[in-house]
Amino acid sequence: MIQQESRLKVADNSGAKEVLVIKNLGGSWRKFTNIGDIVVCTIKKVTPGGIVKKGQVVKAIIVRTKRGLKRSDGTQIQFSENAVVLIKDDKNPRGTRIFGPIAREVKDAGFVKIASLAPEVL
């Protein structure tokens, strides 16, 4: 379960390695988020020469969680790490590549560009 103060890995080439969740968007009393939800994050670890800087506040979409989720057809999908993709205000990704698989729920949430950049959509 992703909540405030959770540290997540970044699954794109924007230059960030790790982010810290500041706020879960989508409700005033919302405590947890899942795959396909948008969160506000701050950058904690970066690679040199990246697009983003340490301490910068950005929006991100959750693409993988350890908790996983159950689908309506009865299947359950679960990943080995919690990961996000950094997005701009127009919901397009900041990076040009995405690493690792993403869940189909990201595409269903309206992030078609992120799904097309991903090497595998589960």
Swiss-Prot record:
It holds the Pfam family Ribosomal_L14. GO terms for molecular function: large ribosomal subunit rRNA binding; structural constituent of ribosome. GO terms for cellular component: cytosolic large ribosomal subunit. Keywords: Ribonucleoprotein, Ribosomal protein, RNA-binding, rRNA-binding. It comes from the Bacteria. Belongs to the universal ribosomal protein uL14 family. InterPro entries: Ribosomal_uL14 (IPR000218), Ribosomal_uL14_bac-type (IPR005745), Ribosomal_uL14_CS (IPR019972), Ribosomal_uL14_sf (IPR036853). GO terms for biological process: translation. PROSITE patterns: RIBOSOMAL_L14 (PS00049). SMART domains: Ribosomal_L14. HAMAP family: Ribosomal_uL14. Part of the 50S ribosomal subunit. Forms a cluster with proteins L3 and L19. In the 70S ribosome, L14 and L19 interact and together make contacts with the 16S rRNA in bridges B5 and B8. Binds to 23S rRNA. Forms part of two intersubunit bridges in the 70S ribosome. This is Large ribosomal subunit protein uL14.
